[in-house]
């Protein structure tokens, strides 16, 4: 009602719960219909079973992506997903297979690097050692225009694990960038047809 009357809010971005339920789809649909939400993001992280177990997301509802995409299609709600590159347990082959599985279903997919958050189990000394995790501090990407937010924020980004070394991880970022570029701009879709 306020958007119709005042023109605001223009839109906003929502981080949805990781264990989606039908109510989230309905809530997102209401926001979409009110013209304040462009789409819902279904956050997968990975399609690799071993990685899901290591990061303790194996039992999360969101891993049944087709249930949620089917529901979004039924109600006319645009959707996308996110995958995280750098999870322990993820290999070059499992990353490629998982990414291709997601985009082959016609799902637009954003890619992010795994960050070690303070207090998270993955950032513990035991996890770092067990999974051979190496990380580097990097400036937090996309936090807003530095002109308006001069304070730089940093995160510890995973750059290597015992499952995917530094060179392989760099190669997977490059491979994913090229593959995503081709997919999102329909180059590879046209070739596949």
Residue positions per predicted region:
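Feature captures the RNA virus RNA-dependent RNA polymerase
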Residues: 173-193
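Residue-level signature of transmembrane alpha-helix interfaces in integral membrane proteins
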Residues: 59-61, 98, 184
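Short alpha-helical segments and helix-capping/turn motifs at coil-helix boundaries
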Residues: 25-26, 96-97, 159
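Short, electropositive alpha-helical surface patch
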Residues: 1-2, 29-31, 93-106, 170-177
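Generic structural hydrophobic/aromatic packing signal, biased to beta-strands
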Residues: 12-14, 109-111, 172
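Flexible glycine/acidic-rich beta-alpha junction loops that bind and position SAM and/or redox cofactors
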Residues: 44-45, 49-56, 85-93, 105-169, ...
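Conserved SAM/AdoMet-binding glycine-rich loop
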Residues: 1-80, 85-87
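A generic secondary-structure signal for well-formed alpha-helical elements
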Residues: 76, 106-109, 113, 179-183
């Amino acid at each position: 009602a306020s958007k119709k009357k005042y023109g605001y809010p223009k839109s906003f971005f929502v981080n949805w719960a990781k264990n989606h339920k039908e109510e989230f789809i309905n809530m997102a649909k209401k926001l979409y219909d009110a013209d304040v939400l462009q789409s819902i993001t279904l956050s997968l992280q990975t399609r690799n079973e071993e990685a899901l177990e290591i990061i303790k997301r194996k039992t999360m509802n969101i891993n049944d992506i087709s249930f949620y995409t089917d529901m979004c299609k039924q109600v006319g709600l645009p959707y996308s997903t996110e995958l995280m590159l750098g999870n322990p347990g993820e290999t070059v082959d499992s990353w490629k297979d998982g990414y291709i599985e997601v985009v082959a279903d016609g799902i637009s997919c954003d890619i992010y690097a795994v960050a070690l958050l303070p207090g998270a189990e993955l950032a513990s000394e035991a996890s770092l050692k067990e999974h051979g995790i190496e990380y580097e501090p990097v400036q937090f990407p996309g936090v807003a225009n530095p002109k308006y937010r001069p304070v730089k924020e940093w995160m510890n980004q995973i750059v290597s694990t015992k499952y995917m070394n530094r060179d392989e991880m760099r190669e997977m970022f490059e491979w994913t960038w090229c593959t995503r570029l081709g997919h999102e701009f329909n180059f590879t879709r046209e070739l596949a047809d």
